[in-house]
């Protein structure tokens, strides 16, 4: 199974990759926000996000919908009831976060005058860290560097200036100990 993910469904590099995999015999799935897109037409199956029109350059709404859709696919394909239960709790968790907008705004003030920020993750959270780094660059024009938290401890940490914001994305899995070590440093 090959899954192509694109907000517009028109990303040429993703479409060409999906096309090549289909020609090679793979079952293809397109995950897009547009049912009439070239990727949707090409793939054996299409999952339409229905996230609505994406107006922000950073495409945060679509990215969130893509991650949720992929997690739901994994949960269903693997029969992981714990993951399904966790995913069902996501809407309530988001509503709870939205209720903390003042605290979030205060935390964001740390980035107001920061010329740079470091964004760390490990394992499954590394991809999210990379995406958040990109979002900060696109929306705040803050220069960011992204590293695996394990890699960060072996060199890059030496270049970290005092007062530079560091965002660490951690999950409750085998990578948690490494992330705790980074926080301790």
Question: What are the language-model segments listed below?
Answer:
Residues 1-2, 115-162:
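Anionic-ligand anchoring segments at beta-strand to alpha-helix junctions in alpha/beta enzyme folds, i.e.
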Residues 80-84, 104, 142-143:
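Short, structured loop/turn "capping" segments at alpha-beta junctions
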Residues 21-23, 38-41, 109-112, 158-161:
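Solvent-exposed alpha-helices and their adjacent loops that cap or buttress functional pockets
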Residues 86-121:
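Cofactor-pocket helix-loop regions in the catalytic cores of large enzyme subunits
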Residues 26-28, 116, 165:
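Residues at the starts of beta-strands that form the adenosine-phosphate
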Residues 1-90, 169-185:
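Glycine-rich phosphate-binding loops that contact phosphosugars or nucleotide phosphates
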Residues 96-103, 144-154, 175:
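A general structural motif
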Residues 105-108, 154-157, 182:
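Generic recognition of flexible, low-complexity loop/linker segments
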């Amino acid at each position: 199974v090959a899954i192509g993910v694109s907000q517009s469904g028109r990303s040429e590099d993703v479409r060409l990759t999906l096309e090549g995999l289909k020609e090679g015999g793979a079952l293809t799935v397109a995950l897009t926000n547009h049912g009439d897109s070239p990727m949707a037409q090409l793939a054996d199956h299409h999952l339409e996000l229905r996230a609505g029109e994406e107006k922000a350059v950073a495409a945060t709404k679509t990215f969130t919908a893509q991650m949720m859709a992929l997690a739901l696919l994994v949960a269903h394909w693997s029969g992981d009831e714990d993951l399904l239960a966790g995913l069902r709790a996501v809407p309530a968790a988001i509503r709870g976060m939205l209720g903390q907008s003042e605290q979030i705004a205060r935390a964001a003030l740390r980035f107001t005058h920061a010329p740079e920020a470091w964004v760390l993750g490990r394992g499954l959270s590394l991809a999210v860290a990379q995406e958040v780094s990109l979002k900060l660059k696109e929306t705040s024009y803050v220069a960011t560097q992204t590293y695996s938290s394990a890699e960060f401890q072996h060199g890059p940490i030496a270049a970290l200036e005092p007062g530079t914001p560091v965002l660490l994305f951690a999950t409750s899995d085998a990578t948690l100990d490494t992330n705790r070590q980074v926080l301790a440093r």
